Amino acid sequence: MITPKVLSGFKDRLPKDAIQKAQLLAKVSVVFQSFGFVPIETPHLEYAQTLLPDASSDIQKEIYRFKDHGDRDVALRFDLTVPLARFVSLHHQTLGMPFKRYAIGNVFRGERAQKGRYREFTQCDFDFIGSESLVCDAEIIQVIVASLKALDLEDFCVSINHRKILNGICEYFGISQVNEALRIVDKLEKIGLNGVEEELKKECGLNSNTIKELLELIQIKQNDLSHAEFFEKIAYLKDYNENLKKGIQDLERLYQLLGDLQISQNLYKIDFSIARGLGYYTGIVYETTLNEMKSLGSVCSGGRYDHLTKNFSKENLQGVGASIGIDRLIVALSEMQLLDERSTQAKVLIACMHEEYFSYANRLAESLRQSGIFSEVYPEAQKIKKPFSYANHKGHEFVAVIGEEEFKSETLSLKNMHSGMQLNCLSFLKALEIIGENDEDL
């Protein structure tokens, strides 16, 4: 006999969990659509050569790669952005530019499984393709803020940086292995200052003095400074080189745009340690953390990539986007007790006391559905205890009971499972009025 078990880093979703996830995805999808983003889908499985060029060395170690039955070198996608590059290169003639897309799907990384981190997880990506305007970068941050607020989250911060600032810092210190250095810096939260110092020595050959000065710059954060105060503080860096000058100027322009959008200033701050480990980022980058749950890591991250299609097409297309980590958000929202704990989406359970009442019960259920009330019929004529126990377990808000009197008079008795209040022999319209009083959960 086979022992039923799930691989480490993967998980089953019970009905309650699946309902919670579906509700969150529905909310963020509405936000995406409200900004004009349209949905696309790409395969879970791609040619390995499609995915590998833009994967960092750490990500390459985590990719699920194998030979298929046709002896083709294939891999499971590790994010939704690289498949987007392939998709846009293949279809850009019919898409029209600029192109705003969102995609929701599972991705796979063989990283160490831990709280809030899985080897299969869902990403919700939204991207603005075909424009280099910073208006697009500002809109992506606007969508991040709107999406988290749609999930009833208010206490979060979007940490913002620019890859040109990081490139400029590396240039200032004469670091030639820029991508490798930034990949290590991106692990600052995971491995700490000592870990970063050791890896920079080992992988990039830097000495202790250079690393100390490098980390002093990279740890510059806005913190509680106003936008004006912070830009005044870092103005001297513009004189170091063109990369630093351009990066800071872009951030100044971005902040102007975010101010025009009237996004609360406490929701975004500059943090020079934000690097984003993926090699395709070229401009503004950001990571979003929940202020009360920073140990969970970033719940939404992304940035600008101005060479999106370089591996697939001679025509270069710029892009900027972000990815919401819905699985991490579920962990956070669960701990905050902000999730629906029901195991059903039906608001009403209809219970029959006798077999011959089912035809009436089914008509009643259909009438409720046509009125926008999700309903189900308990499939067995039982003593009333069993369907009530079922309703308690599933989380139905109401149980409608059809007994002899209700059947003859074409009424129903209704019990509110939260308050315990029961009303007998109600007309359909009266029952509908009572049930519909709290229909925001539908």
Curated annotation (Swiss-Prot):
A single BP term in Gene Ontology: histidyl-tRNA aminoacylation
Subunit and partners: Homodimer.
Lineage: superkingdom: Bacteria
Keyword Cytoplasm: yes
EC number annotated for this UniProt entry: 6.1.1.21
Keywords of this entry: Aminoacyl-tRNA synthetase, ATP-binding, Cytoplasm, Ligase, Nucleotide-binding, Protein biosynthesis
Protein name from the UniProt record: Histidine--tRNA ligase
Name of the coding gene: hisS
CDD domains: HisRS-like_core, HisRS_anticodon
Similarity remark: Belongs to the class-II aminoacyl-tRNA synthetase family.
Any coiled-coil regions, as ranges: none
